[in-house]
C-alpha cells in the first residue's frame, strides 16, 4: 500500500469516527468582531469604514499556514497569483497587482521585497511574518487605504495582529508535515513556537517566537524550488502601570533557496541564480498609551534585508529601512479623531543596478535612497447616535523626489436596523516608483543581461480611486452575510519597455555590426513609463449560516473584471521620442491587469460532533486566467482551464493542552498545468500543489 492511500484511509477513519461521536457541550467562542486596521482604533466590523475581514488565530493554527497565501480562500476579493510559493507569487486584492498589497505587522510595514529586485523568491512580504502560534488575528482590508498607511496601500492592506496578553506564563508549539501525492511535487515540514514569559511581577514580560520551514524541491522544470526558512523573534515589554507600555523588539529571519539543474532548473539557467538566500534583521522600540480621552502608538523600526547568491560579488542586494510611526486617537463628544506623523527612509544597494555609462560598477554597487514625511488626520463623526457614522480623512505625503501628494477618503456607515448595516465610500491610494525607476543614471538588469532598463525622471506615481457600496446583515443568532460592489479607477500604471521595439536600441552605445540586439554581448536599452492605467470592478458576496448549533456553512464568491487602458504615451529614447503605438506593446490594451479569475467561489461545511472535534469539507472554484508578464517580456498568456478542488480535514483537542489535525487538500488532484503546453509562450501556468496531506501536532499551556 503506497503512502497516499494509507493516509487517505486514516483520514477517512478519523472523519467517520468524529461523525458518530456523542454530542456534548458545543459552545464555541466566536470572534467578537472588533478590528483596528480600518480606522486606527478598536471598533465593530459592521461600523468600520472599509470592507474588512478577520481571520482568528485559532483558524490559522488548525490549518496549513505557511505564509499569508494560506488565507486567500477565507476572504472574498483576495487571490494568490503565481502559485503558493512560486517565483512570481503574490497576493492580489480586488484584482490589483501584488506590489499594491501592503502587509503590516501590528500596524507596522513589512519591508522586504525591495531586496528582491529580480524576484526568484516569490512574495517576500507574505513570507517574512510571525508563525501562526504568535498571531491573535489577521485583518484584511479590501480597497486602498493610503489615507492612513501611505504609499503601497493601493489594492488593500493585510494587518497581522500579534498576541499581547503577557500577564501569565503561556506558550504554543506546533510540528507539521505536508506529504504531496502528486508526482514530481516536493514535501514540506514545519515547526513553530510561541512563548510568553512574565519576568518580574507586572513590570517586565518577554515574548519569544520562531519557526523552521523546509520544503523539498519539485522534480519538473519551473516547479517549486527547495527552501529552508527560519525565524527567531523577541519582544520585551515594560509596563510601569496600566496606562503605559513600552517595548523593545528584535528579529532575525533567514530564507535559503536553491534549484537543481535537471529538476526545477534547466541546463541553460545561469548557476548564479540557482542558489541564493535572504536574511532580514529587524530592531525596534515603541510605546503604547491608553488614557481616558487619548490613545498613543509610537514606534521606530529599523530593518535590513540582504540577498546573497552563489557568487556574492555578482548579485548581492541590500535594503535598509527606517520607519518612524506615530498615531494618536482622541475622543470628544460625537467625534473620534485620529492623527499622526510618519517618516520613512529606504536605502537600496544592488548590483542588479548598474551605471548608465558602462557595465562597470558590479563589484562596488552604489546605494540609492528615498525618504518620505507624512501627516494624516481622520475624523469619525457619529451623526446619529449608534446609527449614522461619517468618516473623513486625508494624508499629506512629501516625497523627496515627487513632492507633495494628498490622499483623501470619505466613508458613510448607516445602521438601518439592529441587523442591517449599509456602507459606502470613496478611498484613494498611491504608490511611488522605486528609486531605480526614476534616475536616468541607473539601469536595472533584465532578461539575464539582455536588457538594461534605465530610470525615467518624468515618471509619475501610480494612483487609484475606489468607489464601493455594501450591505452587511447579522441576525445576531445564526445568519450573517454581506454584499459589496466596487469599482477602482487605476491611473498612471508604471510599465517597462521589455519585449518591445525599444529594446533594439543598444544600452551602452554602438555594438559590433555582427552583434544581435538585444543579447548578452550587446544589451538592449529599456526604460519605464506611465500608461493610462486600468479599470477594475466587481462584486463580493459572503455568507455564514449556523445550520445547527454544531453545523456551519460559510461561503464567499467574487466576480472580478479588469481592463488595461494603455493610451498612446510618448517614450523618450536615445534615438528620440517614440509613441506607444510604435512599440509593439499594443497587445496589452484591454487585457486583465492581474492573473486573477473572473469568478471565484469558496464554500466550507464545518461540523463539530463534540466540543473537542472539528471536521470540515470545502469546495473551491476558479475560472480561467489571463496573465500579462509585466517586466518579463510583457507577454500575454492564457490558461483556459477552470479549476475545481475539494478539501477535507479533522482536528481533535485531545485535552486542554494537545491538538491533532489531519487535512487532505485537493482530494481529486486537479491542477491547471498541462505538460504538453508548458513550452508554449502563449500558455500561462505556474507551480501548483496537487493532492496533499497535512498533519500537525500542537501543544499549548
What are these regions (language model features)?
Residues 69, 73-112:
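Extracytoplasmic beta-strand/coil segments of soluble accessory domains associated
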Residues 110-142:
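Short acidic/polar hinge/loop motifs at secondary-structure boundaries
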Residues 7-10, 196-200, 237-239, 424, ...:
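Conserved C-terminal beta-signal and adjacent last beta-strands/turns
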Amino acid at each position: 500500500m503506497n503512502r497516499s492511500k494509507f493516509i487517505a484511509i486514516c483520514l477517512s477513519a478519523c472523519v467517520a469516527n468524529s461523525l458518530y461521536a456523542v454530542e456534548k457541550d458545543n459552545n464555541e467562542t466566536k470572534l467578537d468582531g472588533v478590528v483596528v486596521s480600518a480606522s486606527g482604533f478598536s471598533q465593530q466590523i459592521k461600523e468600520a469604514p472599509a470592507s474588512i475581514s478577520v481571520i482568528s488565530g485559532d483558524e490559522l493554527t488548525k490549518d496549513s499556514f505557511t505564509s499569508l497565501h494560506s488565507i486567500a480562500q477565507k476572504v472574498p476579493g483576495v487571490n494568490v497569483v503565481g502559485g503558493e510559493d512560486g517565483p512570481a507569487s503574490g497576493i492580489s486584492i480586488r484584482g490589483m497587482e501584488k506590489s499594491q498589497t501592503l502587509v503590516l505587522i501590528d500596524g507596522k510595514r513589512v519591508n522586504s521585497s525591495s531586496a528582491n529586485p529580480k524576484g526568484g523568491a516569490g512574495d517576500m512580504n507574505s513570507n517574512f511574518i510571525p508563525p501562526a502560534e504568535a498571531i491573535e488575528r489577521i485583518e484584511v482590508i479590501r480597497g486602498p487605504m493610503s489615507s492612513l498607511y501611505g504609499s503601497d496601500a493601493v489594492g488593500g492592506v493585510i494587518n497581522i495582529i500579534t498576541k499581547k496578553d503577557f500577564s501569565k506564563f503561556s506558550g504554543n508549539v506546533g510540528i507539521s508535515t505536508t506529504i504531496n501525492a502528486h508526482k514530481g511535487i516536493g514535501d514540506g515540514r514545519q515547526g513553530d513556537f510561541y512563548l510568553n514569559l512574565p519576568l518580574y511581577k507586572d513590570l517586565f514580560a518577554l515574548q519569544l517566537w520562531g519557526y523552521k520551514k523546509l520544503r523539498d524541491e519539485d522534480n519538473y522544470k519551473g516547479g517549486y524550488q527547495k527552501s529552508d526558512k527560519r525565524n527567531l523573534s523577541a519582544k520585551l515589554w515594560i509596563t510601569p502601570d496600566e496606562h503605559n507600555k513600552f517595548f523593545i523588539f528584535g528579529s532575525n529571519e533567514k530564507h535559503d533557496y536553491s534549484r537543481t539543474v535537471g529538476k526545477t532548473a534547466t541546463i541553460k539557467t545561469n548557476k548564479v541564480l540557482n542558489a541564493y538566500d535572504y536574511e532580514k534583521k529587524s530592531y525596534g522600540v515603541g510605546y503604547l498609551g491608553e488614557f481616558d480621552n487619548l490613545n498613543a502608538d509610537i514606534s521606530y523600526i529599523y530593518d535590513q534585508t540582504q540577498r546573497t547568491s552563489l557568487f556574492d560579488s555578482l548579485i548581492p542586494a541590500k535594503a535598509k529601512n527606517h520607519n518612524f510611526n506615530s498615531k494618536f486617537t482622541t475622543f470628544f463628544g460625537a467625534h473620534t479623531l485620529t492623527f499622526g506623523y510618519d517618516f520613512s527612509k529606504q536605502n537600496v544597494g544592488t548590483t542588479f543596478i548598474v551605471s548608465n555609462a558602462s557595465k562597470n560598477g558590479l563589484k562596488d554597487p552604489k546605494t540609492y535612497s528615498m525618504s518620505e514625511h507624512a501627516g494624516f488626520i481622520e475624523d469619525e463623526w457619529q451623526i446619529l447616535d449608534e446609527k449614522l457614522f461619517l468618516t473623513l480623512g486625508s494624508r499629506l505625503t512629501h516625497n523627496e523626489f515627487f513632492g507633495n501628494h494628498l490622499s483623501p477618503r470619505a466613508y458613510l456607515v448607516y445602521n438601518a436596523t439592529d441587523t442591517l448595516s449599509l456602507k459606502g465610500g470613496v478611498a484613494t491610494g498611491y504608490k511611488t516608483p522605486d528609486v531605480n525607476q526614476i534616475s536616468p543614471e541607473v539601469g536595472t538588469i533584465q532578461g539575464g543581461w539582455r536588457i538594461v532598463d534605465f530610470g525615467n525622471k518624468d515618471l509619475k506615481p501610480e494612483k487609484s480611486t475606489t468607489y464601493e457600496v455594501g450591505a452587511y446583515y447579522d441576525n445576531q443568532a445564526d445568519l450573517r452575510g454581506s454584499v459589496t460592489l466596487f469599482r477602482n479607477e487605476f491611473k498612471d500604471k508604471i510599465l517597462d519597455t521589455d519585449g518591445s521595439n525599444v529594446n533594439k536600441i543598444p544600452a551602452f552605445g554602438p555594438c559590433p555590426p555582427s552583434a544581435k540586439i538585444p543579447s548578452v554581448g550587446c544589451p538592449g536599452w529599456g526604460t519605464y513609463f506611465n500608461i493610462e492605467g486600468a479599470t477594475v470592478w466587481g462584486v463580493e458576496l459572503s455568507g455564514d449560516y449556523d445550520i445547527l448549533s454544531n453545523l456551519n456553512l460559510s461561503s464567499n464568491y467574487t466576480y472580478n473584471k479588469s481592463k488595461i487602458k494603455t493610451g498612446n504615451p510618448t517614450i523618450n529614447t536615445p534615438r528620440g521620442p517614440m509613441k506607444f503605438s510604435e512599440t509593439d506593446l499594443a497587445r496589452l490594451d484591454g487585457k486583465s491587469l492581474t492573473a486573477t479569475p473572473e469568478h471565484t467561489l469558496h464554500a466550507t461545511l464545518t461540523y463539530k460532533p463534540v466540543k473537542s472535534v472539528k471536521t470540515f469539507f470545502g469546495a473551491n472554484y476558479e475560472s480561467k486566467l489571463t496573465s500579462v508578464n509585466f517586466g518579463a517580456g510583457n507577454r500575454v498568456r492564457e490558461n483556459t482551464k477552470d479549476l475545481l478542488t475539494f478539501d477535507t480535514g479533522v482536528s481533535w483537542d485531545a485535552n486542554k493542552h494537545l491538538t491533532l489535525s489531519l487535512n487532505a487538500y485537493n482530494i481529486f488532484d486537479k491542477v491547471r498545468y498541462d505538460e504538453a503546453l508548458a513550452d508554449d509562450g502563449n500558455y500561462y501556468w505556474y507551480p501548483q500543489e496537487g493532492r496533499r496531506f497535512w498533519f500537525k501536532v500542537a501543544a499549548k499551556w
